[in-house]
């Protein structure tokens, strides 16, 4: 939202959700539910990055219903990390988990684009989203649709 000088990233899942007590714990870098390693840095680093730009991190979750993580950054703040390769990240994630439906919604003052793996898989008509040619095509498709040029 350029008018508000904010960049908002929202992750929504309809998974198992977490209880209120755990929501408070997940922003601690030394808390994790994983058994492979004892540190969970994803959300703590996201929180740190939002706050260093004057933004915030909000986590809403309900056990059995899912979780919504909203990260708000200062859009023009000098310390806001660059967006990076959004298209590549979306396609890599979608192709790594082909049985999960991913919806990527990119919106700003000039662009409003939705990438939905349900629609993609229907269009592919049995061709795997994991095929290298499909991955490259989808990456180019997303890049062209979110380009502001």
Language model: regions and residue ranges:
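ATP-binding "lid"/motif region of the histidine kinase catalytic
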Residues: 33
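Flexible, glycine-/charge-rich segments associated with ATP-binding catalytic modules
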Residues: 52-149
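Short beta-strand-loop-beta element adjacent to the nucleotide/active-site pocket used for signaling
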Residues: 1-9
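Acidic ATP/Mg2+-coordinating residue in the GHKL
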Residues: 13
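Glycine-rich phosphate-binding loop
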Residues: 37-48, 82-86
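Short conserved segment of the HATPase_c
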Residues: 20-29
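Polybasic/polar functional segments that serve as interface/processing modules
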Residues: 7, 49-52
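Glycine-rich G1-box
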Residues: 16-17
């Amino acid at each position: 939202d350029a008018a508000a000088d904010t960049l908002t990233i929202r992750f929504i899942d309809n998974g198992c959700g977490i209880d209120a007590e755990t929501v408070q714990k997940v922003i601690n870098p030394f808390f994790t539910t994983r058994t492979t390693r004892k540190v969970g840095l994803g959300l703590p680093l996201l929180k740190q990055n939002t706050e260093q730009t004057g933004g915030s991190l909000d986590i809403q979750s309900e056990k059995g219903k899912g979780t919504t993580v909203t990260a708000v950054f200062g859009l023009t703040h000098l310390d806001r990390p660059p967006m990076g390769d959004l298209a590549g990240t979306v396609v890599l994630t979608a192709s790594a988990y082909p049985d999960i439906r991913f919806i990527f919604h990119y919106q700003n003052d000039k662009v409003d684009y939705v990438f939905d793996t349900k629609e993609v898989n229907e269009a592919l008509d049995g061709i795997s989203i994991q095929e290298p040619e499909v991955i490259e095509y989808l990456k180019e498709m997303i890049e062209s649709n979110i380009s502001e040029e």
